[in-house]
Structures are given as C-alpha cells and as structure tokens.
UniProtKB/Swiss-Prot annotation:
InterPro entries: AAA_dom, DNA_Partitioning_ATPase, P-loop_NTPase. The lineage of its organism: Bacteria, Pseudomonadati, Chlamydiota, Chlamydiia, Chlamydiales. This is ParA family protein TC_0871. Belongs to the ParA family. Transmembrane segments: none annotated. Pfam families: AAA_31 (PF13614).
Length: 255
C-alpha cells in the first residue's frame, strides 16, 4: 500500500481537486483499490464526492479510539474508490479526548492505517492548507508527499515554509517528495519562467512536467459530486489529470 499526502501551504491551489482526480483516475482507469482520506475540516473533498459532511463520521472518532477505521470508510462507486469523510471535529481533535494527553499523538494515524495496508493499493490524504497537527500526522503516516502550487506569488513563496516543515519531518520519518504539481496553468503566462525557477530552487528536480490548466468543468463536476471524468470526460481537465496520474505512476513504479 502506497500512502500519499497531498499538501499546500495556501488555499486555492487545487489541492483537493488534485486529490480527488488522482484517486478517481487510479480507481477508474488503472483498476486500483483506492482510499481517499479527507483530513481537512473544510470537508471540500467530501462534498466534492457528493457526501454531506454533517451526516458522516470522520477519522476523528478513530483517532480518539471510539470507532474502528472500517466503520468510517464509505464506498463512492463500484470502481474501487472509497472515502473517509471529514467533519468539523477534525479541527480540534488533537486537543480533546485521549489525544490531548498523548505526546506521540502524531503517530496515531500511521498506526491506524497499518491495519488496512492489505485492503488498498493507494491511500491518498487531503491535508489542510496549513502547517498544523493534521498535516504533520498525515506526512508521518505517508511514504510520499505531493505538493500543490499555482503560478502566483503567495503560492510559490509559501512553498519555502512548506519545504522547511517537510524537511523537519523527513529527518525523523522516511518521506519522499513525489513532486510539485502546478494548477490553474496558462501556457502564455508572462511570469511562468520566474515561478518555475523559484519552485526548482525550493524543490530541486521535483517540478512535475504535467500542468493542470484552468477549466470550468472542474467546478461543474464538483457541483454534481463527481469527478470530471464522469461529467466531462473529453474536457482538458480530464486530459490533464490523466496525464498527471500517468506521470506519478511512472515515478512510483520502483518505490
């Protein structure tokens, strides 16, 4: 089982959309068994797959020892895509209940996921766009980190802080930076070279070749609670996310 934490330091980087479509592509087109984990209290991944966050338990109850992980997994479709939804309790889970007194609470998610390692080919975790307990727990539980950015000043500058955060974790836990993916890409953007140069400086050799172009069909798919592969299979967003999935599979082949 390969576990990937999808990260950003700023909202609006298509982090959740990337998580959703990577998982959907692996399940639908590569016949993989995929578990998506919405680990962001905003619950956009949950809503984007057509579930109401107010109606389901999140990993919070599992982290607190109140339920088993099998009790919070929801089947999304017959392709092999499952989801653990998010809820607002995630936002404060580390300061309540049994986690509050556990000095090793960051390790708990890793332990929980080890109990299902034979059930899935991939676990993909959508983390909050901040350097918090949830993000640290996800990175400790993961073998790989996928970083999302946009060709904007604040997004790219935030990568420097994220790089320092990840470096601190990888010094204590094995963690591979799978790559940096750029979304909302305009091939005619006048500052493209400057942005890509800064990313290469922050994460040398990690900028992925695939660019996710801006496409309204992604937002339209979210309204229907489905991946864009289902609502607009011929859209450029579908093409881009399939290419991204292929590129990541190539990078993962020997790891």
């Amino acid at each position: 089982m390969k576990t990937i934490a999808v990260n950003s330091f700023k909202g609006g980087t298509a982090k959740t959309s990337t998580t959703l479509h990577l998982g959907a592509a692996l399940a639908q087109y590569h016949k993989a068994r995929v578990l998506l984990i919405d680990f962001d209290a905003q619950a956009n991944l949950t809503a984007g797959l057509g579930l109401d966050p107010d109606c389901y338990d999140s990993l919070a109850v599992v982290l607190q020892g109140e339920k088993q992980i099998s009790e919070v997994i929801r089947s999304i479709d017959s392709s092999g895509l499952d989801l653990i939804p998010a809820d607002t309790w995630l936002e404060r889970v580390e300061v309540s209940g049994s986690l509050a007194a556990d000095r090793y609470s960051h390790e708990r998610l890793k332990t929980i996921l080890s109990t299902i390692e034979h059930q899935y080919d991939y676990v993909i975790i959508d983390t909050p766009p901040s350097l918090c307990w949830l993000t640290e727990s996800a990175l400790i539980a993961a073998q790989h980190a996928l970083i999302c950015a946009t060709p904007e000043f604040y997004s790219v500058k935030g990568l420097e802080r994220l790089a320092t955060f990840i470096q601190g974790i990888s010094s204590r836990h094995p963690l591979n930076i799978l790559g940096v993916t750029l979304s909302f890409w305009n091939y005619r953007g006048k500052n493209n070279a400057a942005f890509t140069e800064l990313i290469q400086k922050t994460f040398p050799g990690k900028l992925l070749n695939t660019r996710i172009r801006r496409d309204i069909t992604i937002s339209e798919a979210a309204i229907h609670g489905k991946p864009v592969f289902s609502t607009a299979p011929s859209a450029r967003a579908s093409e881009d996310y399939l290419k991204l999935t292929e590129e990541l599979l190539f990078l993962l082949r020997d790891i």
